[in-house]
Amino acid sequence: MENIKHIVQFSGGKDSTCMLLMMLEKGMQVDDIIFCDTGMEFPQMYEHIAQVEQYISRYGKVVTTLKAEKSYEYMMFEHIKTKGKRQGQKGYGWGTMLARWCTAYLKTQVAKRHLRGQEYIDYIGIAYDEPKRHEGIAENVRHPLFDWHITEAQALSFCYEHGFTWGGLYQEFKRVSCWCCPFKSLDELRVLYHKYPALWEKLKDMDNRSWNQYRADYSVEQLEERFKQEVYIKKISIPLFNDQVS
């Protein structure tokens, strides 16, 4: 048992941040804190990671940042598939519900390689109000937040109380994942369009270069047209002056 490492899987989001802070405050064993950098995080997320590193230094801890050999964009546009029904195709394109290659290649496989040959217990930030994600966990996996009955809202509040704000990202997005994630809701994509124009232009360029469309129902250009129409409709719906006669 002495050789078993206790590994915190740290995404940088509210749940894994809360879990890490609580584990350290409770004096639990933490041997390694792993952050798998996809290279596609929001700028505020990288600032948050740096803030966390500064905070946990009081416990003598550091964040181990891991990266895949090839970048997200290389795999999306340049990698040649060597097997499967799309064998020989250049680039994986956008991830889909049936083929989330991005998560597998940039996170799961990277972490497994780092931990290969070690005996370890994985600590993952699954909140109490995510029971389906807690079901059927592996023998060497722990979900401390679930065990402590900490909900997602409570995890976020705990982080705020400790001074971690992500630059306001959680006021705009339910999930703070990669900024280009095709699984974002329409509301989140609307925020990206209106408040992050540089990232939106990058997203549009990536969609134009990809062999598959960003979403099944919309390309990024179609989303942009929709959001522009929404602004126009809202604008013409506002009366220019008060028509009521006093």
Q: Could you describe each region identified by the protein language model?
A:
Residues M1-S246:
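Nucleotide-activated chemistry modules centered on ATP-dependent adenylation/adenylyltransferase
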